[in-house]
Amino acid sequence: MANLRTQKRLAASVLKCGKRKVWMDPNEISEISNANSRQNIRKLVKDGLVIRKPNLMHSRFRIRKTHAAKRLGRHTGYGKRKGTAEARMPSTVVWMRRQRVLRRLLRKYRESGKIDKHLYHTLYLEAKGNTFKHKRALIEHIQRAKAEANRTKLIQEQQDARRARAKAARQRRAKAVEEKREQIYTAAEKIEE
């Protein structure tokens, strides 16, 4: 078998790749061995006797499979962990994510009119003060606050109505007393006459 080291080197130079990427047709070795210049190699490339091999793919199938399993909680036990809990998921990042979720919810509720700007501001500061552990806690708090506000409003209206009725009754009684007094005075005047 002929030594094709020179031809391989020239082919790598012509094809602008490494020597391991150069393929030479094993059936045409005699013709390839006669090529001793770049020009001849270019002709062989054109004829298809010398070819540049395609790049090898680096499959991500296995890593995708592992990621899918990790999302389900596999391969994440104590034995698989290298860093501290803080290094793996910094508490600052957890805090920022939670605040962004809560503030986005508050903004959405304010824009849709579910809460007014005063309640928004109060809840914003409470969220900043770590009152709410998660989104559901905030939603439940808002529902309770609205229910409490409605209850307070209803009680206030009932008290106002009761006061109005009591005032009307007082006025009626006072009017009746006044009329009775007038009758007594008129009767007394008639008797005196």
Swiss-Prot record:
The keyword Cytoplasm applies. Keywords: Cytoplasm, Ribonucleoprotein, Ribosomal protein. Its main location: cytoplasm. Component of the ribosome, a large ribonucleoprotein complex responsible for the synthesis of proteins in the cell. The small ribosomal subunit (SSU) binds messenger RNAs (mRNAs) and translates the encoded message by selecting cognate aminoacyl-transfer RNA (tRNA) molecules. The large subunit (LSU) contains the ribosomal catalytic site termed the peptidyl transferase center (PTC), which catalyzes the formation of peptide bonds, thereby polymerizing the amino acids delivered by tRNAs into a polypeptide chain. PANTHER family: 60S RIBOSOMAL PROTEIN L19. Residues 164-174 have a biased composition (Basic residues). NCBIfam families: PRK08570.1. One of its GO terms (molecular function) is structural constituent of ribosome. There are 2 genes for eL19 in S.pombe. This is Large ribosomal subunit protein eL19B. One of its GO terms (biological process) is cytoplasmic translation.
